[in-house]
A protein has these predicted regions:
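Phosphate-group recognition and catalysis centered on beta-loop-alpha active-site segments
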Residues: 1-237
């Protein structure tokens, strides 16, 4: 039986990366519910794409296992794809979820949704569509938006001045400090790129820090010592 790795969180908020992806197939309702059923997780992270017919689905890569390119494929075709479980066997319930299904799971279980905007070229009107879907579920207050495109995070900040928004980055550049502080945007950074000095400096300026993707208890302990606010993980609990 697969199981999580237990740690002493000491108040750090754990985010289940693509759902509880260390146990269930990533970015499926099964993975979301596996995380939702565990009190240890503050939030559930996922990735959103727009299909060719204007639906919003959750998947990490831009192609599903059949090779279909999500932005150029209609929803019904994507939904018909049956994914494999962790053991390599197909499981009929493992299908590409929709954004509204994910939001409902987060809302029903009282978890924060951490939603990565995957398409850097996504027009502002499509960002509004994503926001409207979440509003229709009456759960905008329960969502954190994240993304590697600072421009897209700025777009969301302008549309939703009070929303929690995190800029994703593989690395640290000195110019990020002013960018984040000036625009009220938090940092979601690959853990190896975060120094203790920068963590303290960001916190003093009111910027929250999320690190990804940390699956080592020893590494987590180090960054908990830095005072990070969130740890995104596949398996730590």
């Amino acid at each position: 039986m697969r199981d999580t790795v237990k740690i002493d969180k000491r108040g750090v908020r754990l985010i289940a990366h693509r759902g509880l992806s260390g146990i269930e197939q990533e970015n499926t309702c099964a993975a979301f519910i596996a995380a939702a059923n565990r009190e240890s997780y503050y939030g559930i992270e996922t990735d959103v794409y727009r299909t060719s017919d204007g639906k919003y689905v959750l998947h990490h890569d831009d192609r599903v296992c059949t090779g279909a390119y999500i932005p150029e494929t209609d929803f019904d075709t994507l939904r018909a794809v049956v994914m494999e479980d962790k053991d390599g066997r197909e499981r009929w319930d493992l299908r590409v979820p929709t954004l509204d299904e994910y939001v409902r799971i987060c809302k029903n279980y009282g978890k924060v949704g951490v939603l990565e905007i995957k398409q850097p070229e996504l027009p502002v009107e499509y960002l509004r569509e994503i926001i409207d879907i979440i509003k229709a579920e009456d759960y905008l207050d329960g969502i954190i938006f994240i993304g590697f495109s600072f421009e897209k995070m700025l777009n969301i900040r302008k549309m939703l001045p009070d929303q929690t928004v995190q800029f994703l980055s593989f690395d640290w550049k000195d110019e990020y400090f002013d960018m984040l502080v000036r625009n009220g945007i938090d940092l979601d950074i690959a853990y190896g790129a975060l120094t203790e000095e920068n963590a303290h400096r960001l916190h003093e300026a009111g910027v929250e820090i999320n690190i990804w993707t940390c699956d080592s208890a020893e590494v987590a302990e180090k960054y908990i010592g830095y005072g990070v606010d969130y740890i995104t993980t596949d398996i730590l609990e």
